[in-house]
Each structure stands twice: as structure tokens, then as C-alpha cells.
Amino acid sequence: AYAGNAAVADNASVVATNPALMTEFKKAEFSVGGILVDADVDVAGTIGGVPANHKNVIPNAIVPNMYAVVPVTERFTLGGGLNVNYGLKSEYGNQYAAGVYGGRTELTALNFNLSGAYDLGYGFSAGFGLNAIHSDAEVERHLGIGGKAIARQLQAKATQAANAGQAAQAAQLNAVAGQLANMPSNTSVSKIKGDKWSLGWNAGLTYKLNENHRWGLAYHSAVNVKFKGEYSNQFPVAYNALLMRLAASGVSLPISQATGGENVPGSLTLNLPAYWEFSGFHKITDKLAVQYSYKYTEWKRLKSLTAYGNSGNTLFHKDEKFSNASRYALGFSYNANDALTLRAGVAYDKSASVNHPSISIPDTDRMWYSLGATYRFTPNLSADFGYSHLRGKKNSFKEGLSGQFKVTSKANLYGLNINYRF
């Protein structure tokens, strides 16, 4: 359950968790592995009275990692690593009824880290790292039942115009209503895709009272990712002349600029959060140890997903209104013999979207239940095995004017790392 992440120096992955822990290594070590994420997230609901159910909205994924730690002197250690800092993906079918809220949402932030650590003496060590982050993002939404719903609004406005003697306006509104009513549900209303390199940093501090007791504090900086990419939708460009007129009549289309399927330049700034983590490690007996962690992530920086055109016009906007979130973890490790260490832990993970849930990122509060083991084949070669079961809290909420949804979630994580000490 990642308990003790900032205070436990089991393998070279400390490069990513707390670089100050690298001073615990007296020999060079290399670690490579990954985690298979097998998620089961289902959405049940309605939009405008139409069923909007979707199963398995989070595809399975493999999350890789690779780290190395190299002592340079008795006090100074270098390290480097590759890992996924942030990753999320949800995918609904392109004919999903609530496609304007839940289509395809994907973000992957691949982190390349170079760190150094120094033993300050008196039990203290400090570490600092630089991060080069390559981020890929893609957001796509579809019309779903939106075309028919907007068509009904336009027909009502057309009737009002006709009754007021405005025959030309009524005819135009009815014509647009007919086009929208006949648009397929898989019509793309927005698609933006881009990638970007960004820079960040991380730092850590540890205090070791003795070989049996250690505390750690780690910090990872916020990163502002300024994507430049391409935006498109499948609405005819002739609609651009109607957008302001329709908005003035109280009817809004799910686009702010029609592109007719052509790509136009677009940009999107994604504010990834900073986080703090405090951890402790205590060896109670020769065989048994306890570790714990508190992690605070500043998700409040992520207020919305907004894409802009070259002239500053809004191409896509989605409120997220994330809140800062906390995570609590407690774990135990048991040295069964010289070759085998067993581990178990639990964690409570607070959702960042608890105050503004959305089916695009169907997050909920969740519990972690974890088991793991380290097996040492030789004094230099070992393998870490881990399994976690995540169970999310059921979450019912409204989205937009007519969407009502309930999200149920669980996941199984399977991890394997191979470690070699030189």
C-alpha cells in the first residue's frame, strides 16, 4: 500500500520517492519492473431520461519503471530513474448517450529523473532531483443524445418566433433543429491532442535515529504543462455564423468554433499538482517492522481543462474543480528468513474530485489492501512481488442539467520488480 514510501530504502525506487534515501545504499543497485493495473469501473445513469450505462470505462494498463543508484563517495550518491508520474485514462464508446460528458480522456506523464543525495551527518541526509517530464494528452467528446436534445430547444424557439411573426427566424431555427436531430450520436464535438516536455524538481530529507528507526519527508514540485496541439470537431463551418445568434436566444451548442472536421491549432495548460509525503519506519524486533505514510497532494491547482485557439478564443472547456487530497497508509514487513521478506498494508485514498465528480474522470474515495514479498535469489539478485486490491466508494452525482450517474469502482494491481546489486 506504499506505506513508508519516504522512509524505506528497499530498492533503487527511492529515486522516485525520496532521493535522500539513496545514502542508505553502499553498493550500486539497478531496479526494473512494472505494475499491471486491472481496473473495473462501471457507470450507470441517465441523461435526458435516456439510459447512459457503460461498463469498464478504465482500460487496463502497464505502468513501467526503471531506477539506478550509484554511490560516488562515502557521503555522496547519484541516482536516476524513469517512471510514470501521473496517468489517467477513461474511454467511453463513441455512441455513448452522454458522450458530451464522457468520451476519451487520457493523460500520461513520463518522468525522467536525475538525483543526488548527501549524508549530512548526525543521522541526517538530504537529496535533490531534477525531472524532465514528457506529457501526452488527448480529450475527445461526442454528441450522444445532445443533437436531439438541442433540436427540441430550437423547435420551441422556432414556435415562439413564428408566433411573434418572425417567419424567417423561425424557418432558420427549424432548419438547424432538423440538422441537429439527424446528426449521428458519434459526431465529434471536440477533439484536442498534444504533447509537451516540462521541467520539475523534487527534494527529500531523512533522519535516522539508528538502524531501527528512520523518518523521511519528500516533496515533488508542481508542473505546468503547456500543450500545443490540434483541435477539431465535425460540425459544419457554416454553424460559426449561427453560434452567437443561438446563444442570444438561450440555446448553446456543445462547440464554440465549428471546424468541419479540419484541424486547427489549439493549446491547453494542465496544472499538475505538487505533493508532500511524510513517512516513518520502525524495526520492532529482529523480524518485524512497521512503516506508515501521510501524503498530501495539491490537486486544487487543477480547476478546469480549457483549450484555446490562436486568437484566444475558447475551443473546449470542462470544469474539474479538484480539491486537495490526503492519503494515509500503514504497513508491516516480516523477515521470514534470510531469503524471504513478507509484507502487508492498508491505505485510505481520498478522491480529489469529491466536490465536483465527473464521469470523464470517475474518481472516488478508495481503500487499498496490499500483500507483497521480496525474495533474494542471491546476495545481489532479488525480486519484489506485490498485489493490491482497491475498492472505491460508490458515488452518485449529477452532471450538467440532465445527467444523473452512479459510479462503482474496484481494481487489482499486480507489481513485479527485479533488483540487482553490483
Residues of each region from the PLM?
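Outer-membrane beta-barrel porins/channels
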Residues: N5-D10, G48-A52, A61-F422
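N-terminal periplasmic accessory domains that precede
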Residues: V15-L21
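Glycine/alanine-rich phosphate-binding loops at beta-alpha junctions
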Residues: V43-A44, V57
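Transmembrane beta-strand segments of Gram-negative outer membrane beta-barrel proteins
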Residues: A1, T23-D42
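Residues immediately flanking
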Residues: P19, G34, L82
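A general structural signal for short secondary-structure junctions and capping/turn motifs
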Residues: L21-T23, A68
